[in-house]
Structure formats: structure tokens, C-alpha cells
């Protein structure tokens, strides 16, 4: 099938690779290179980098609302467009241009967690399951009818990165199935009940309040790892907490217990991966060798 692929971050790359292996990708659309790193040099998106490695033509318009951009898109003569974490709103002329329309790969069980950060929000909310939906796109934000859906359990110690990687591979597999069965799939309108929105993650959500229950803090750490990274102050230094598990232990909220376990409002969490500023992530034993925490140390955010 002649396809246009539209995506930008790491999450989109396995999908691009799967489509390239099994279909004809006539063009790749992604976000333009942007300044990044200490030197603030323009850095291409992961999708642009991989597409160029595969020898695929790449476009990165800043808007698809101009008549010129829409004419260039339509001239590709694609049977369908596959969209995953692209980053631009698709106006109606773009949605209408491919013969079979535009198919979106969304990392949630729609209509729950429409929007920008469905993987983060599922973990933060304590959802026990999530999944991938293949959706026929329309003008609304993730409102289109669902063609195919697959569920997966969220593990008790899974981070955003863990779930991101699993769902990315699941999306690549599922879109191949959807394209192969497109003539037989029946679009299912999303129900009005159960709609929630996955707002973008704000940095203000990352500071840990140790008076909260351990279960909430556990979800906060896992649901913000690796970015932006839940953080606390230890010995006056900001430390990112990247992996954890619920643990036994009692103490005043924020009290550091043996083995980098920290007491919460109720219960405790054992930190299994932490990162000081300017350092690489470390497991507890190595972390404490270079950053000993005397008895009576407290974690806090202000």
C-alpha cells in the first residue's frame, strides 16, 4: 500500500520501520529540527534520522494549513496516511487527501486519555491496564472511530519508559494488522461516557510531597520517569528518583530509612534508581557510596 508516514519522537520509529518493511512509504512527515543540547544546535527528530537512514524522502513543514502544503501532500497520491505522535494538527484537506484517510495510532484505550500524554497519565492515575487503539482520524482531538484495539496490563514497577517501549512495539504490530484487514474492519464510534484528557506533563508535577501515601508517590515516580523525573531534595541537593517499589517501613514523612527507603504519609517507597544532578542514574548501593545519607536524613521539596 502507498503510505505517507507522519510521526516525530522515538515512539514513532518502530512503526516507521514496520511500514517500510511491509509497504511503500512514499514520504515521511515529521517536526522540523530544533535547537537542543548545550550547544543549542539544530537536532533532527528521531523519525527524521531513521527515515534518512532508510533512504526515505522527508518533509518537515511548520504548518499544514497553507494551500501549498496541502497541495504537496495530496500530490503524493497515497492510499492512506499513518499518524503517530506527529505533533501538528491535521486540517480537513489533509485528512481527506489519502484515498483511505488518515489512521492514527494512539497509546490508550480510547476514549480514556485522549490527548498528549496518555502513557504518563495512565500510570499516574493508577490504571491497571492500557493499550493501543488504531483510529480513523477526524477533526476532533482523538475523537475518531476505533478500527482496532489491544489491551495490556500495566506492571506494578513499570515506568513510563518501560510502557512507552512496549506500546510502541505493539502499535507497530497492530497497524500492520489493521492495514491488512482494512476492507473488513468496522469503525466503532467512541462512547460519550468515560472520556478523559491526558494533559501535557508540567514540571510542577515533579516535586514529591512526602506527606502523601506511598501508593501515590510510587505512581508519581514511575509515571514521570525518565522525563521530567520526580525529584526531591536530599542533603540540600536535588535528586531525581527514577525507579521504585512499595516497601515496608515507618517514619516521619520524608525520613530516609535503610537501603534508600523513604517514609511517606502512609507506608514507604524503596528507591531502586536515583540520579544526582550532572550524574548518571545509579542503583541504591552505588548511589549511597558516593552520596552517604546520615541517620536522620530527610527528603523534602522546599
Curated annotation (Swiss-Prot):
The keyword Magnesium does not apply. The keyword Protein biosynthesis applies. Its EC number is 2.1.2.9. It catalyses: L-methionyl-tRNA(fMet) + (6R)-10-formyltetrahydrofolate = N-formyl-L-methionyl-tRNA(fMet) + (6S)-5,6,7,8-tetrahydrofolate + H(+). It is an enzyme of class 2 (transferase). NCBIfam families: fmt. Belongs to the Fmt family. This is Methionyl-tRNA formyltransferase. It comes from Cereibacter sphaeroides (strain ATCC 17029 / ATH 2.4.9).
